[in-house]
Swiss-Prot record:
Keyword check for Electron transport: no
SUPFAM superfamilies reported in the protein's UniProt record: P-loop containing nucleoside triphosphate hydrolases, Restriction endonuclease-like
Region of interest called Disordered, as start-end residue ranges on this chain: 999-1018
Binding-site positions, ATP: 32-39
One GO cellular component, as annotated: DNA helicase complex
Name of the protein in question: ATP-dependent helicase/nuclease subunit A
Pfam families with a match to the protein in the record: PDDEXK_1, UvrD-helicase, UvrD_C
Oligomeric and partner information: Heterodimer of AddA and AddB/RexB.
Biological process terms in GO annotation: double-strand break repair via homologous recombination
Keywords on record: ATP-binding, DNA damage, DNA repair, DNA-binding, Exonuclease, Helicase, Hydrolase, Isomerase, Nuclease, Nucleotide-binding
EC assignment: 3.1.-.-, 5.6.2.4
The organism's taxonomic lineage, starting at the top: Bacteria, Bacillati, Bacillota, Bacilli, Bacillales
UvrD-like helicase ATP-binding domain span: 11-478
PROSITE patterns named in the record: UVRD_HELICASE_ATP_BIND, UVRD_HELICASE_CTER
Species: Staphylococcus haemolyticus (strain JCSC1435)
């Protein structure tokens, strides 16, 4: 390291940042904590290489994690070069950089690998016309490769193969086995040499020396729990020693101490002692014993605590015995030998899949992203495994290699970088920046140990190795955010769990000195679920309402400090983000926020396959493909499409309990003479549908099948009408588009498409709606913690902390680990017995530790997004659980290791640490520090713990009292809030050269057009989507949500339109009895719900039947109801058509009738209007005519345009009567 310039006194950089910018002459690792300005440092280093060292920009290789990061980095560098050129216009070097920036290699590693392949394809005998494989082809070719390999083995089955299939498959099929092989494939190709890694898996089972790797780890894990058990036993003893007449209890403790000490004598595990261990029975702690102690002034709590500690001790030893040491050392080693042939066979299957898949891709001349890396590595490596001549050319070309987000690098990427970097660590040209505490992509095979190995190897002075620089000053957050985050992770994270020691170097230090001294404590909300009978809300719904209350409070009472003006401003919606581990709660929040009139956005591209509308369509496709899948069949039947009730489904099943499949039960029920005839009719309709779709799928592509399903059942229209309709519609179109993409591949058929979708689900690959909001849109955002990485928000609400970690992989029969290999239980095919093997026990425990470590790092990412304040929310069932968390055992300065290794959810760790800090009554053995004075300032938290009973919260259904507003409503309602209107207009109007066209919607309903013209607002863009009117039952809230609630005006309006849509026109006029019978018929046919009857304005309908208009319609030649229309607005407005884009008007006419060659239309209105005292009917008529004048004009002109004939019309108000509009428009 040399030539670091002296930092000027007025430099904006910290000493560590300055050093990071100018250090050279050796490999440099910058450990950049959250908010420490790493991107600015990286850009400045690149700029100084160009300006100060006069290195051409295309002589630098800058590797970023995403394409977006690469574009932003290149843009920043380009701007700085331009700025430098303006300041020094005669500098020819800078002028050249303006040209070379476009060829600069600032990209993802995938993009760099692709360039290597494009330039050197001949080295690996690759056709230069290769293309990147599509998702569809990639998924299905891999599936096809697996099929062919398994088919070969099924044809000539080996005993080991049969054992594997039996062990790793379900009772019904081998889908689980296939899924496992796909995971195995993906794990393998994340290694630089997949075949070598696969061979190493077998060696662990065959080589006695390799067994020691597992045995050592088993012993280490066992020690953790035995030592924790012994410590817990000592606590029990200490509590008994404080009591009198507890000698018998102490005798048991003494005996247990002797046994426990024998288990780990000389710090070596005695397997026999543990396997043969049986616990002693502790004498009962009687009321008499408690009373005796109380009489002597000794709290009986000592006895209770002692008993609890002793129970915990027994539980810990039982866990060691049952989890790690069920069988002897020798038995475990024998099992490993027996498993070796099975592992050898499994490895060969995976090798065959790799080869088969590679051959299929090569024959089609396609590459996937893993091929980019492996082919590039192949080009850069000679036959001896050293750098090839091509790699050496790249070494000469690049003066420095800069890697961003180094903690997310995998083994293959590390191998590629090592081939093109110069020198070793002490004199190399590799600059790496990242933060292992933010390594959260293990599911993509990111390997944080690569970062940690260098972190430990490199030194702060760079002596004899690489240079390590810690950027620990945070310029983002208030002191309270940083100190509390430090305090949490100081007591939670270390190398054992978290994979880094959270020491003085890892901590966050306050750097945003412009913040005022206003106190903003971290708020931890423990929401105790109300399970009372009068509250049916689920835990997630309760939490969603609570979150909405917190948002309201922030908006009404909190401020944001503006660094530039050094003043406060009121908090706005865009200052708030809601972070959760996943997005399953998004729909709940969306509904609740709508009730609260809170603008809200969630990027539902994540969690796509979990969305209700997508699951419905997939259930439909799976049922059509194979109705013998009960979950999907029943799911489709219960859906809004077919609306079978749980009682109906139960009745079907009860009739034939012994059927293997629900489909068989349906067939049997339909033949049952005693079956409910209405249910049989409903089933016949359903089965006819399924048969029809099955037949249709045989001769039509999948996308046409989906389109038919959408159109037959108004699927798009229904989901468009729900909360988040735009996103739901985008999700449905996304699935349709995937089917179109599938059809363009070489694969065909519904079965293959479902396999493709299943693979996307397995890979957690989403393709839902795009993020359609900008950074300045004033909405509350919801996103996953993963999505929030790199972002910052004034207020962070980190919720769903009580959601359990996803430990599903730990329950699988085979577990993979890059370092420790493959863990599989031993399965005896003849005896049909499974029991844990040495490998499965060890790898399961290691994988659980790695999983919790990554979850801990996700917590760190979430907490470090906040600038002003953190609000943490968790929900628990009982308040007693909080007391247990407060008393979690500690070891040294941290939560006891065994508790962290077995943690189930973030809330347990966070609450325990903060509650211990705040408690004034906690015993010393549960506390981390005796006094706050003992704490370093960077660790001194500011915390406000709030425990709330849900029943105490206000959960009024604001939906019944509040109405959402749009910009068009503001002026109609008489609002003079011009600032608000302008703000909304500014957000909705995207400025670009063709602004006039963008402010004119491509398609509008007549109602929308009416509001637009009434308010003279133009600039709201409506998405172009087909819309159809459907029955009220699909739009109504579920029955359980409507109980004891009045329908809203718009719901009653829809209900009345449905009644009128089917109303018979009889020349003799309907009687009240006939009308009542007609309404009952609508209920029986499920057109309206039974509870809707009370909201039908019965007398108003009768008044219509008694009217002249009713009789006029009965005498008409033709009657058309609910007629949709779409028409060019220019033609309706009688404007000359031009080449410019036109606007389309769409709408629905309630009724049209033809009489004496003259067309008339009728529009029903259920409006309630205030008739002021003294108003005449004529004045009311004038008011109503004016209100609907524009809408009726467009109805009339539209129909005249379509029919090419004069059209007259009527408005019919249920509260006023008919009104001719033939002369008024």
């Amino acid at each position: 390291m040399n030539n670091i310039p002296i930092k000027p006194k007025d430099a904006q950089w910290t000493d560590a940042q300055w050093k990071s910018i100018y250090a050279n002459g050796q490999d440099v690792l910058v450990a950049a904590a959250a908010g420490s300005g790493k991107t600015a440092v990286l850009v400045e280093r690149i700029i100084q290489k160009i300006i100060r060292d006069e290195i051409d920009v295309d002589k630098l290789l800058v590797v970023t994690f995403t394409n977006l990061s690469a574009r932003e980095m290149k843009h920043r560098v380009d701007q700085r070069i331009q700025q430098a050129s303006i300041e020094d216009p005669r500098n020819e070097h800078l002028k050249n950089q303006r040209i070379k920036i476009h060829q600069a290699q600032i990209s993802t590693l995938h993009s760099f690998c692709l360039k290597i392949i494009q330039q050197h394809y001949d080295v690996i005998d690759l056709d230069p016309n290769f293309r990147t494989i599509s998702d569809v082809e990639n998924v299905l070719l891999l599936e096809q490769s697996i099929d062919e390999v398994l088919e070969k083995h099924y044809d000539t089955p080996d005993i080991e193969f049969l054992t594997l299939v039996e062990q790793l498959s379900s009772d019904r099929n081998d889908d689980n086995f296939r899924d496992l092989l796909k995971r195995f494939y993906n794990f393998s190709i994340a290694n630089p040499s997949p075949f070598e890694w696969l061979d190493s898996l077998v060696e662990i089972y065959t080589d006695d020396n390799k067994h020691k790797l597992y045995l050592d780890e088993l012993e280490r894990l066992s020690k953790i729990y035995i030592k924790a058990a012994y410590h817990t036993l000592l606590e029990a003893e200490n509590n008994f020693l404080n009591c009198i007449e507890a000698e018998k209890h102490l005798d048991v403790i003494k005996l247990e101490k002797f046994k426990c000490e024998k288990m780990i004598e000389g710090n070596v595990i005695n397997f026999e002692e543990i396997i043969n261990y049986t616990s002693e029975k502790l004498p009962t702690i009687t009321k008499k014993l408690k009373d005796t102690n109380e009489d002597e002034g000794i709290s009986s709590q000592f006895l209770t605590n002692a008993k609890d500690f002793f129970d915990d001790y027994k539980k810990l030893l039982s866990e060691v015995k049952n989890k790690y040491l069920m069988r002897s050392y020798e038995d475990l080693k024998v099992d490993m030998k027996r498993l070796a042939p099975r592992i050898q066979y499994l490895v060969q299957i995976v090798k065959d899949i790799i080869n088969g898949f590679a051959e299929k891709k090569r024959s089609r001349n396609v590459l996937d992203f893993s091929d980019y890396e492996h082919f590039a590595l192949q080009i850069l490596t000679d036959q001896e495994g050293n750098a090839s001549p091509i790699a050496k050319e790249y070494r000469s070309q690049f003066e420095e290699i800069l890697v961003d987000e180094y903690q997310d690098t995998n083994q293959v990427q590390e191998a590629i970088i090592s081939k093109i970097k110069r020198g070793d660590e002490s004199n190399g040209n590799l600059f790496m920046v990242g933060d292992v505490k933010q390594s959260i992509y293990k599911f993509r095979q990111a390997d944080p140990t690569l970062f940690m190995d260098k972190y430990h190897r490199f030194t702060k002075d760079g002596d004899q190795s690489g240079l390590r620089i810690d950027l620990s000053k945070n310029f983002r957050s208030r002191k309270e955010v940083l100190a509390t985050t430090n305090y949490l992770f100081d007591h939670m994270m270390d190398e054992e769990v978290g994979e880094i020691e959270y020491d003085a170097d890892a901590r966050l230090y306050f750097g945003a000195t412009k913040y005022s001294d206003k106190s903003m404590p971290l708020e931890l909300h423990a929401l105790i679920q109300d399970k009372s009978s009068d509250n049916d809300l689920e835990k997630s719904e309760q939490e969603a309402r609570y979150i909405a209350e917190q948002v309201k409070y922030i908006i009404e009472h909190k401020q944001v400090y503006d660094m530039k003006s050094e003043t406060y401003r009121q908090a706005t919606f865009k200052d708030i983000v809601i972070l959760e581990r996943g997005l399953k709660n998004a729909r709940n929040l969306q509904q609740v926020f709508k009730d609260y009139n809170i603008p809200f956005h969630v990027n539902s591209k994540e969690g796509y396959f979990e969305q209700t509308e997508v699951r419905l369509v997939l259930s439909f496709l799976r049922t059509v493909d194979n109705p013998l899948q009960d979950i999907y069949l029943v799911g489709l039947m219960r859906s809004v499409i077919y609306q079978f009730t749980e009682d109906e489904l139960a009745n079907i099943r009860v009739q034939s309990m012994n059927d293997d499949y629900f489909y068989q039960s349906i067939l049997h029920y339909m033949k049952d003479q005693e079956a409910n005839p209405l249910l049989v009719e409903k089933l016949e309709h359903f089965m006819d549908d399924i048969n029809m779709y099955q037949e249709y799928s045989q001769s039509h592509p999948v996308y046409q099948l989906i389109d038919k399903f959408y159109n037959d059942h108004y699927v798009i229209q229904y989901f468009s009408g729900l909360i988040g309709g735009k996103g739901r519609r985008a999700n449905l179109y996304g699935l349709f588009n995937k089917a179109v993409e599938f059809e363009n591949s070489s694969f065909r058929g519904l079965y293959q498409f479902i396999r493709f979708i299943d693979e996307l689900i397995e890979r957690n690959k989403d393709f839902g709606e795009e993020n359609v909001i900008g950074p300045n849109d004033n909405v509350v955002r919801m996103m996953t913690v993963h999505s929030s990485k790199g972002l910052e928000f004034p207020y962070v609400i980190y919720s769903e902390l009580s959601k359990n970690f996803n430990k599903g992989d730990l329950r699988k029969p085979l577990i993979l680990n890059q370092k420790y290999g493959l863990g599989i239980d031993y399965f005896d095919l003849e005896q049909n017995v499974t029991y844990p093997s040495l490998s499965s026990v060890v790898i399961k425990s290691i994988t659980e530790k790695e999983l919790i470590s990554e979850e801990m790092r996700l917590m760190y990412v979430a907490l470090t997004r906040a600038k002003e304040q953190l609000i943490l929310i968790g929900t628990i069932d009982k308040e007693e659980a909080l007391e247990k968390l407060e008393r979690l055992p500690i070891s040294g300065n941290q939560i006891a290791l065994h508790k962290r290794l077995s943690a189930d959810r973030p809330f347990d760790l966070i609450y325990s640490i903060l509650a211990k800090y705040q408690s004034t009554s906690l015993l010393p053995e549960y506390r981390f520090e005796k006094s706050i004075d003992n704490l370093d300032e960077s660790l001194r938290p500011t915390v406000d713990i709030k425990i709330a009973q849900f029943e105490e919260l206000s959960i009024e259904d604001s939906e019944s009292e509040q109405e959402s507003r749009n910009i068009s409503d503001l002026e109609v309602e008489g609002s003079h809030d011009d600032t608000l209107k302008q703000q909304i207009n500014d957000q909705l109007s995207f400025k670009y050269p063709y602004l006039k066209d963008t402010e004119k919607p491509s398609k509008q309903s007549v109602s929308e057009l009416k509001r637009q013209l009434e308010t003279e607002e133009s600039g709201t863009s409506y998405e172009r989507v087909r819309q159809y009117r459907i029955g009220v039952s699909t739009y109504e809230r579920p029955k359980f949500l409507r109980e004891n609630k009045k329908r809203k005006a718009n719901e009653i309006g829809t209900l009345m339109h449905t009644v009128m849509q089917h109303l018979p026109f009889k020349e003799t006029r309907m009687t009240e009895t006939e009308l009542n019978d007609y309404i009952n018929e609508l209920i029986e046919k499920h057109i309206i719900e039974e509870d809707a009857k009370k909201d039908i304005q019965f007398e108003a309908v009768m008044n219509f039947i008694r009217s002249d208009l009713y009789m006029t319609i009965t005498q008409a030649d033709k009657v058309y109801r609910e007629l949709p229309f779409v028409v060019n607005q220019a033609r309706v407005d009688e404007m000359p058509e031009s080449d410019e884009d036109v606007s389309i008007i769409q709408g629905m006419i309630d009724l049209i009738f033809l009489k004496d060659d003259q067309y008339y239309f009728v529009d029903y209105k259920t409006d309630a209007f205030n008739k002021r005292r003294g108003m005449t009917d004529e004045e009311v008529g004038i008011q109503l005519r004016d209100k609907y004048k524009i809408q009726m004009k467009y109805y009339k002109n539209t129909l005249e345009t379509i029919l090419n004939s004069k059209v007259y019309g009527y408005l019919y108000f249920f509260q006023f009567g008919q009104m001719s509009i033939e002369e008024d428009v």
